Amino acid sequence: KKEYAGLLDIVMNRKTDWGVIFDLFHKERVSVDKLLMGPDFFEIVRECYNRKYPNIVFSDFLWTMRSIYLPLFRIMKMDVPKADLYHCVATGYAGVLGSMAKHFHGSSLLISEHGIYTREREEELIKADWVKGVYKNIWIERCKKMSFLAYEKADIVTCLYERAKSLQIELGCPEEKTQVTPNGVDPSRFENLVVLPQMQDDKVHVGAILRVTPIKDVKTMIRAFAYAKKKAPSLKLWIMGPTDEDEEYAKEC
C-alpha cells in the first residue's frame, strides 16, 4: 500500500511523497509507538538493512532506527493551527512542521536560516561520542532529508550571506527560492566610539564578536590567527562575547 511504500522511501532515503506520510499520521488509528514496534516498520527496517547495512548487528540497527524516527513521527502527529503564512527559523523539525502545515492548509511557507541546520547538525554528529561509525551517517542522512523537504515545500528561503546560500543550494534548495538577507548594521552608530588605551598602538587589531562555543569553532580561528601572526607580527586578536555557555571549552580556548 502507498503508506508502506512512503515509509520505506523515507527510511531508504529515496524521493518521498510526503503528502501521503502527513495524511497517514493524521489518521486517528495511527499510534506512533505501535507503528515503531509493529511488523510493518520491522519489515521496512529489515529491507533497508539487507540492502544497505548487512555487515552491522541487526538488533542495534533496528533500535537505532526506532530512536531516529520516534521524534520525527511524533512531530507529524501534531495538529497545526490554520494560518496565512508559516515562518520557520530553521529547517529540521521546524521545517517538517511548516511543510506539514502548508500541506494541510495550503498557506505560504517562509524559512529564514541563521545558521545552516544540516551543516551544524553534521558537525555535531561527527564530533559526538554517543553515536559511532556508520550510525553517524544514518543520523546525518535523516537531517539532510528533513532539510530537503523544507526547501522543497518553502516559497522563500533566506540566509545571511552568499556562502550560506551556496550551501542551501548544495543541500537541495532551488536557487530561485533563495534570498540573502544580511544582518543590518548602521555604521554611523560606531563612528564616535572611544578607542581603548590598549588599542592605541601600531598593531593591526582584528575583532571577533561571538559566543565562545564549539559551534563557533573558536579554536580553529585561534589557530588560523597564530598562522597569520607569523606572517604579520603586528596583528592582534580580540575575542569578545559570553563564555558561560560552555565554560570548559572557553578555558581551552
List each model region and its residues.
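A short, histidine- and acid-enriched strand-loop-helix "catalytic/donor-clamping" loop
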Residues: 109-139, 155-156, 186
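Carbohydrate-associated surface elements
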Residues: 163, 184
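A short, basic/aromatic alpha-helical/loop segment that forms part
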Residues: 187, 213-218, 228-231, 246-247
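Short N-terminal targeting/anchoring amphipathic segment
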Residues: 77-93, 104-110
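Membrane-proximal helix-turn-helix segments that form the acceptor-binding/catalytic region
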Residues: 73-82, 117, 134-157
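Conserved nucleotide-sugar donor-binding subdomain of glycosyltransferases
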Residues: 1-83, 135-138
